[in-house]
Swiss-Prot record:
Tarantula hemocyanin is a 24-chain polymer with seven different chains identified. Pfam families: Hemocyanin_C (PF03723), Hemocyanin_M (PF00372), Hemocyanin_N (PF03722). The gene is HCB. It is found in: Secreted, Extracellular space. Glycans are attached at N312, N316. Keywords: Copper, Disulfide bond, Glycoprotein, Metal-binding, Oxygen transport, Secreted, Transport. Disulfide bonds join C534-C582. GO terms for cellular component: extracellular region. Hemolymph. Cu cation 2 binds at H324, H328, H364. This is Hemocyanin B chain. Its main location: secreted. Hemocyanins are copper-containing oxygen carriers occurring freely dissolved in the hemolymph of many mollusks and arthropods.
Length: 627
C-alpha cells in the first residue's frame, strides 16, 4: 500500500496541463476499460457545466466508476485512461469528486482549482501579458505579472469587483459543489449526504447576505432580487478566456433577456417556480405516484432544497423541474441560445466563475425568496430560544482597538505554471489583491446560574446596523442579512465564565490551502486531512466596512449543546473546521438545530430588546477599511 505522500505525488499530474495529451506522462496506456464505455460524449474543448443535465450525467458516470474502483492502482489506471478522451473540465470535476470520497485517498489534497484552471480566475489580458514576459526572461527566473482590472467606475457594479471576482470566494463555490454533487446517489456510492438540500439553501443564503453587506460597505443599496423572467438584465463582461478552446466567455450586454434553449425554455422555469410556490403554500410536495410528502419543520427545508437545486434527491424532478441549475445555464446563453454562433457560454455556467457575475446574487436572492416563503409558514421560535440559567453578560471584540476590526487589501501570488506549459523551469505567477482583516478575538462573559457544569454551543452572527440611506434595520429585515461568523461548543462551569475564541478558528472558514508546488514537496501528507476545504476563505470572514467606520451588530447566543448534539462529530479528527457551510465527512450534520438558527424564521417582535432572552446578546462592532 503506497503512503499518502506517494499517492499525492502520483495524483498531481492528472491536474497539470489539462489540455495536453498525457500518454508520455504516465507510461504505457492500457486498453480502454469497458467501464468507461459511453464516456467522451461531451467533446474536448467544450466548456463543462455542472449545472447542465447532460454534462452532469456523463460526469456522474465517471466519478461513480472511479469511486467504486477496488484499489488505488485501479483508480489511477482508470484516471489515466479517461484523461485521453474525456472533456477537460468534466475530467477534473469527476476525478476531484472521486478523490474527495475514496477512502484510500484520505489525506490526499486536491490542488487549488485556481492553479489548475487559472483562466477561470485571471483575466485574459493578464495571461497574455504573462506569455509575453516569458520570452523576455531567462528560463530559470521567476516571473510575476500584475493582474489587470476588468472594468471601471462607469459601471457602479464594478465597486464590488474585488468581492465578486475574489479568487478564494470563487474557489469555495467550486469546491462546495464537489463535496455536494447534485447527482450524488447514496445507493450507488453507499454514503449519505446528510441535510444536503438544507445545506444548498443555507450556503447560498449566506452568500447573498454577505454580498449585501459588501454592497452596504460601498454605499450601495441591497440588491434587487431577480423576479421577472422577461425583464432586461444588467450587463457583465468577465474578461476571461478559456484555456482549452481559446475563446472568451460570452459577455452579456446591458438589456439582454432570457431566451429559449434547445434543452430548456423560459416557460419551463416559470412553470417550475409556480409549482414550487404551490407546494410551499399547500405544505406538501407530490412524488411521481401522487403521494404527498409534507414540508414539515424537521425535513421540509431539506426536501425543498433538493427540489429547487435540483439534485437526485428531488422527490419529483419531472414535475418540479430543475429551476436553479437550468437558470444558471439559460442565463449563460442569452447571446447564443441555440448555439448557432458556437460561442462559449457566460460565466454563470461554471461553479468556478459564476460568482463574478452580479446576476448570480440576484438569481440566488430570488431562489432564497422561495425558501423564505416556506420559512414564513413555520411558527416563529419562542421557547426554543431559551437556555435557562445561562446569561450572556457582555461581549467584546479584542483587536488593536476594542470592538473595532480593521480591513485592508493585501497582495498574493497565484502560480500559473502548472496549467500552461511555458517551456521553462522558473515559475510564472500572477500578483493580485484580495480583501483581508486583522486577526481578532471574541471575549464573551457568561454566567451559569446552575450548580453543575453545562455544555453550550456558542453561535456568533454579524449584520449591518443601517441601510445605505442611514435608516436602522429593524429585526425583521436584519435577520436575512445576518452572516454566520462562528459556531463552537464550550463547557460552562457554575458561576462566571470567560470564553475567548480567535477569528482564525471560525467554523465557517478554512485557514489555508496548499499550493500545487507545496503538495509536490509533501507539505500536506497527513491521514487526517481537512475534508471541508470547501470552507469560506478566512480573509473574507467579515465584510469590508468603510473608511469612516461602518457599524455592525454582533450577535452572540448560547444554546444547550447536549440538546443540539448529533452523532460523534470530531471523534474521527476529520472535518473539524468549516462545518457550518460544508457539513462533516461521512457523519450527520453536527448540529440538530436548523441551519441559520435563530435567524432562519420570521421574528415576531417590534424591537431587538423585545426578542432577546438572557442567553442572547447584541453588541456594536465597527469595521473600518484602510486603503
Amino acid at each position: 500500500m503506497p503512503s499518502t505522500a506517494e499517492k499525492q505525488r502520483r495524483i498531481l499530474p492528472f491536474f497539470q496541463f489539462t489540455s495536453l495529451s498525457t500518454k508520455d506522462k504516465f507510461g504505457i496506456l492500457v486498453q480502454r476499460d469497458p467501464r468507461l464505455a459511453g464516456l467522451g460524449v461531451l467533446g474536448r474543448g467544450v466548456l463543462f457545466s455542472c449545472f447542465h443535465e447532460e454534462h452532469l450525467k456523463e460526469a456522474t458516470q465517471l466519478y461513480e466508476v472511479l469511486i467504486e474502483c477496488e484499489s488505488f492502482e485501479e483508480f489511477l489506471d482508470l484516471c489515466h485512461q479517461a484523461r485521453e478522451y474525456v472533456n477537460e473540465g468534466l475530467y477534473v470535476y469527476a476525478v476531484s469528486v472521486a478523490i474527495l470520497h475514496r477512502q484510500d485517498c484520505r489525506g490526499v489534497s486536491l490542488p487549488p482549482v485556481q492553479e489548475v484552471f487559472p483562466d477561470k480566475f485571471v483575466p485574459s489580458e493578464t495571461l497574455f501579458k504573462a506569455f509575453k514576459e516569458v520570452r523576455l526572461h531567462p528560463d530559470d527566473e521567476e516571473i510575476i505579472v500584475d493582474i489587470e482590472k476588468t472594468g471601471n467606475v462607469k459601471d457602479p457594479e464594478y465597486n464590488l469587483a474585488y468581492y465578486r471576482e475574489d479568487i478564494g470566494v470563487n474557489a469555495h463555490h467550486w469546491h462546495w459543489h464537489l463535496v455536494y454533487p447534485a447527482t450524488w446517489r447514496p445507493e450507488v456510492v453507499h454514503r449519505i449526504k446528510d441535510r444536503k438540500g438544507e445545506l444548498f439553501f443555507y450556503m447560498h443564503q449566506q452568500m447573498c447576505a454577505r454580498y449585501d453587506s459588501e454592497r452596504l460597505s460601498n454605499g450601495m443599496a441591497p440588491m434587487v432580487p431577480f423576479h421577472n423572467f422577461h425583464e432586461p438584465m444588467e450587463g457583465y463582461s468577465s474578461h476571461l478566456s478559456s484555456g482549452i478552446n481559446g475563446m472568451p466567455y460570452a459577455f452579456r450586454p446591458h438589456g439582454r433577456i432570457l431566451k429559449d434553449m434547445r434543452e430548456v425554455s423560459v416557460q419551463d422555469l416559470e412553470r417550475s417556480r409556480e409549482r414550487l410556490l404551490d407546494a410551499i403554500n399547500l405544505g406538501y410536495v407530490v412524488d411521481p405516484n401522487g403521494l404527498e410528502t409534507p414540508l414539515d419543520e424537521l425535513h421540509g427545508i431539506d426536501i425543498l432544497g433538493a427540489i429547487v437545486e435540483s439534485s437526485n434527491d428531488s422527490v419529483n424532478k419531472s414535475y418540479y423541474g430543475s429551476l436553479h441549475n437550468w437558470g444558471h445555464v439559460i442565463m449563460s446563453a442569452v447571446d447564443d441560445p441555440d448555439g448557432r454562433y458556437q460561442l462559449n457560454p457566460g460565466v454563470m455556467s461554471d461553479t468556478a466563475t459564476s460568482l463574478r457575475d452580479p446576476i448570480f446574487y440576484r438569481w440566488h436572492r430570488f431562489i432564497d425568496d422561495m425558501f423564505q416563503e416556506y420559512k414564513k409558514s413555520l411558527t416563529p421560535y419562542s421557547s426554543q430560544l431559551q437556555f435557562k440559567g445561562v446569561i450572556v453578560k457582555s461581549v467584546c471584540v479584542r483587536a488593536k482597538t476594542a470592538d473595532v476590526v480593521e480591513t485592508t487589501f493585501a497582495n498574493a501570488l497565484l502560480d500559473i505554471s502548472h496549467a500552461f506549459n511555458f517551456g521553462r523551469t522558473g515559475p510564472v505567477k500572477v500578483r493580485y489583491n484580495h480583501l483581508t482583516h486583522e486577526p481578532f478575538t471574541y471575549k464573551i462573559v457568561v454566567d451559569n446560574a446552575g450548580t453543575k457544569t453545562r455544555k453550550a454551543t456558542v453561535r456568533i452572527f454579524l449584520g449591518p446596523e443601517h441601510d445605505n440611506l442611514g435608516n436602522e434595520f429593524d429585526i425583521g429585515r436584519l435577520r436575512r442579512l445576518m452572516i454566520e461568523l462562528d459556531k463552537f461548543t464550550t463547557v460552562l462551569e457554575p458561576g462566571e465564565n470567560v470564553i475567548e475564541r480567535d477569528s482564525i478558528d471560525s467554523s465557517v472558514t478554512i485557514r489555508e490551502q496548499y499550493t500545487y508546488r507545496q503538495l509536490q514537496d509533501g507539505r500536506s501528507n497527513r491521514e487526517q486531512t481537512e475534508y471541508c476545504s470547501c470552507g469560506w476563505p478566512n480573509d473574507l470572514l467579515v465584510p469590508k466596512g468603510n473608511e469612516h467606520g461602518m457599524k455592525f451588530r454582533l450577535f452572540v447566543m448560547l444554546t444547550d449543546a447536549v440538546q443540539g448534539q448529533v452523532g460523534d462529530h470530531g471523534a474521527t479528527g476529520l472535518c473539524t473546521d468549516a462545518v457550518s457551510y460544508c457539513g462533516a465527512k461521512d457523519q450527520l450534520y453536527p448540529d440538530r438545530y436548523p441551519m441559520g438558527f435563530p435567524f432562519d424564521r420570521d421574528i415576531k417582535a417590534d424591537s431587538i430588546p423585545e426578542w432577546l432572552h438572557p442567553n442572547m446578546h447584541f453588541s456594536e462592532v465597527t469595521i473600518t477599511h484602510h486603503q
